[in-house]
Amino acid sequence: IWKGLVGSEMCIRDRPIAAASVAQVHKGILKDGSKVAIKVLRPNIEQTLFRDFKFFYGICNVLEFFSTNCKRLSLKEIIATFAHSSLDEIDLRLEASNSEQLSENFVDYELFDTPKIYWEYTTKKLLTSEFIDGVRIDEINNLKTNISVKNLTTVASEIFFYQTFRDGFFHGDLHPGNIFINQSGKIIAIDFGLSLIHISEPTRPFH
């Protein structure tokens, strides 16, 4: 689908605008003029992860053989949890679904949203979403003068508490690089790979 899109359905910039360990993001423009962000998995990332986790398991076996303290730490369980999360991260359909779920949870809240997902251009290895023209939340000096930083702080706090106590479904990686403010002052969250955390209703008051 990646090769088929180029030239036929959208124009894509060669140079990525962001890059991380498992994927990189390119800016593109659809035939109708819509600006999009295209997240693409790195080649052979699944095989690389399996190889790395196999290596870590081997190290754990050695450590546990020579040290009872290491065995008590349950290192294999920690690695298994991390492996499960990492494999979820490399299925970009899950990230797209997480983004839409969070958007639906705030459908009646005008000051928060997530980028629109273009499912017709999204697969396990490719995620196409609305490109966000905005300012990172830590770059407040670049915000328009009519946007109140105090109000943004209040809204951000409300968003966090709604996610935690009302929905039990929240973005757990809200660092400044994943939070943008658009021209109207709305908070837009991006990047939902590892970050969506589900909290069962009975335990929400304890988080």
Protein language model regions, located:
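Single conserved hydrophobic/aromatic residue that forms the stacking wall/gate
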Residues: I1-G7, I12, I197-H207
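Conserved ATP-binding subdomain of kinase catalytic cores across diverse folds
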Residues: S8-E9, R13-V135
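The start of beta-strands in P-loop NTPase/AAA+ ATPase cores
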Residues: S34, K125, G168-F170, G177, ...
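Feature representing long, continuous alpha-helical segments
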Residues: L126, V135, K150, T154-E158, ...
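AlphaC helix of the protein kinase catalytic domain
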Residues: I137-T145
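Conserved kinase catalytic-core segment
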Residues: I147-N182, F192
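Catalytic activation segment of kinase domains across protein kinase-like and atypical kinase folds
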Residues: P176-S200, R204
